[in-house]
């Protein structure tokens, strides 16, 4: 029994010990390499080869998708080169109705989406007005 415990203790020491016999027992620290930093470095090298220059003071950028949603960037990092724009930062995919100030940015090609939004707003307004009862004063009912 004691021999078994001694053998197990010796095995445990071998796994924990990182040096020789007289070294302190400690666990090896595992460092995880993040692949995103490598990808970012490669991207920055390619952008530097293109010769992009940063554009400051851009508050927002919107990409209009064919399905009616918008990819919205708030305070993006914008860089430009010849016929090339790079927009990076945190983005959100939102429906067009959730960002009403972008309607002014839409062109003639998005006229169908504007009509759909107007119909949806008017239908919602009509649905809400039916539920509100008419207020009647007690004096006029005599």
UniProtKB/Swiss-Prot annotation:
Protein's organism: Dictyostelium discoideum
Pfam families: NAC
GO biological process: protein transport
Family: Belongs to the NAC-beta family.
Domain NAC-A/B per the UniProt entry, residue ranges: 37-100
Keywords: Cytoplasm, Nucleus, Protein transport, Repressor, Transcription, Transcription regulation, Transport
Spans annotated as Disordered: 17-38
Cellular compartments annotated: Cytoplasm; Nucleus
Source taxon at top rank: Eukaryota
Subunit text: Part of the nascent polypeptide-associated complex (NAC), consisting of nacA and nacB.
Role of this protein: Component of the nascent polypeptide-associated complex (NAC), a dynamic component of the ribosomal exit tunnel, protecting the emerging polypeptides from interaction with other cytoplasmic proteins to ensure appropriate nascent protein targeting. The NAC complex also promotes mitochondrial protein import by enhancing productive ribosome interactions with the outer mitochondrial membrane and blocks the inappropriate interaction of ribosomes translating non-secretory nascent polypeptides with translocation sites in the membrane of the endoplasmic reticulum.
Protein name: Nascent polypeptide-associated complex subunit beta
CC terms in the record's Gene Ontology section: cytosol; nascent polypeptide-associated complex; nucleus
The keyword Transcription regulation belongs to this UniProt entry's keyword annotation: yes
